[in-house]
């Protein structure tokens, strides 16, 4: 269902100058919550941007009726520290510092340098590039350094 929602709202969000990072539908305290997270290629995602996007996509979602039950729509920034789950997440996070945990228990911190549909390239502290297929990743999380 979230894939259909993503397909429906992605073009609208891009027409406003922002990028759709993720869509998730969760249940919290018996209430369905549709979370839409954004990236602003020109800077931060402000509260005004979230409100603008919410006001535009909310009626669109109501007309499409993808979610049968009542739900709360939350529009937010993708966040400074987040888990990268899809090739799209990796592509939208290029140049960021990440913590990588592999299935074989190896872990390291690096800068995400490149990503495609099968793998990601990480620049290690010694400037070497380590290429890892997504299937070998256990968890990758962006790191915010103060």
From Swiss-Prot:
| Transmembrane regions listed in the UniProt entry | none
Question: What is any one of the record's Gene Ontology cellular component terms?
Answer: cytosol
**Entry keyword Cytoplasm:** yes
Quote the Gene3D superfamilies the UniProt record gives.
RimP-like superfamily, N-terminal (3.30.300.70)
Q: Which UniProt keywords apply?
A: Cytoplasm, Ribosome biogenesis
Query: At the top level of its lineage, which domain of life is listed?
Result: Bacteria
- What are the GO BP annotations of this UniProt entry? ribosomal small subunit assembly; translation
Where does it primarily localize?
A: cytoplasm
Keyword hit for Cell cycle: no
Q: Which InterPro entries match?
A: Ribosome_maturation_RimP, RimP_C, RimP_N, RimP_N_sf
Q: Where in the cell is it found?
A: Cytoplasm
The UniProt function text for this chain reads: Required for maturation of 30S ribosomal subunits.
Q: Which family does it belong to?
A: Belongs to the RimP family.
UniProt-recorded name of the protein: Ribosome maturation factor RimP
Q: Which organism is it from?
A: Helicobacter pylori (strain J99 / ATCC 700824) (Campylobacter pylori J99)
């Amino acid at each position: 269902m979230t894939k259909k929602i993503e397909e429906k709202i992605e073009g609208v969000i891009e027409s406003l100058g922002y990028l759709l990072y993720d869509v998730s539908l969760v249940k919290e305290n018996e209430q369905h919550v549709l979370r839409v997270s954004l990236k602003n290629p020109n800077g931060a995602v402000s509260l005004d941007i979230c409100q603008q996007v919410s006001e535009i996509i909310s009626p669109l979602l109501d007309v499409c009726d993808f979610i049968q039950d009542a739900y709360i729509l939350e529009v937010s920034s993708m966040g400074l520290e987040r888990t990268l789950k899809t090739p799209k997440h990796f592509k939208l996070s290029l140049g960021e510092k990440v913590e990588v945990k592999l299935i074989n228990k190896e872990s390291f911190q690096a800068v995400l340098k490149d990503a495609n549909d099968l793998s990601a390239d990480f620049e290690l502290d010694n400037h070497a590039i380590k290429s890892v297929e997504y299937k070998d990743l256990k968890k990758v999380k962006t790191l915010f350094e103060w």
